[in-house]
Amino acid sequence: MSTALATLAGKLAERVGMDSVDPQELITTLRQTAFKGDASDAQFIALLIVANQYGLNPWTKEIYAFPDKQNGIVPVVGVDGWSRIINENQQFDGMDFEQDNESCTCRIYRKDRNHPICVTEWMDECRREPFKTREGREITGPWQSHPKRMLRHKAMIQCARLAFGFAGIYDKDEAERIVENTAYTAERQPERDITPVNDETMQEINTLLIALDKTWDDDLLPLCSQIFRRDIRASSELTQAEAVKALGFLKQKAAEQKVAA
């Protein structure tokens, strides 16, 4: 266990009245309960920093770890946790809501300002479709069973962020969307091979450019930028895979010129 992890665990234990508990035992308990998941020490430290910074209690679900699909975790603050950090802010001076079937408006008042911070969230933008299993079966979620309550939570949390500058913390609904988007990106956008171009391939390209009376700056780099959909301003920015494709294009052009001649 790292020193930073032990120190943060000790601060949490002291704050919740468990300072007599060994830090290692506390961490083990947290890993098995509120912070359950395959979290690295760095991720665990991040969770403890958030918990201590906002005075949240993991054993009452004010903060907990939400597992993502990359063997990591997303720190989630429950509605009770959001309520705590809002009410404990020294400048908080109350809030009210206006809600109908289409939207919910939250107003938070600060003691040091003349006008309230106001945020409106819309049902058609926030509501989520039912979850689906791999077999295609729909599972009713909170947006189906309690849509107005969920929208009210959304409005309160977004308004609190603007009013007090809360950052780096999410509610469960946001965490689920983050995990879904991360998984989609990982599945649809595989990591690009960034192996640099080797000297042999570069020499072949240069030879063909001379033979075709073309240049890097005027001809090949603009073409590569268009084909690979990124701004490429120097030959050194090409990867080996991209250079091979560019070489293939030049060879095709050379063959066409030879036939035409």
From Swiss-Prot:
Keywords: DNA recombination, DNA-binding
Full protein name: Recombination protein bet
Pfam families, per database record: RecT (PF03837)
Function: Gene bet protein functions in general recombination and in the late, rolling-circle mode of lambda DNA replication. Has a function similar to that of E.coli recT. It is a single-stranded DNA binding protein that can promote renaturation of DNA.
Domain of life: Viruses
Biological processes per GO annotation: DNA recombination
Gene Ontology terms for molecular function: DNA binding
The organism of origin for this protein: Escherichia phage lambda (Bacteriophage lambda)
Gene: bet
Signal peptide residues on this chain, from the entry's feature table: none
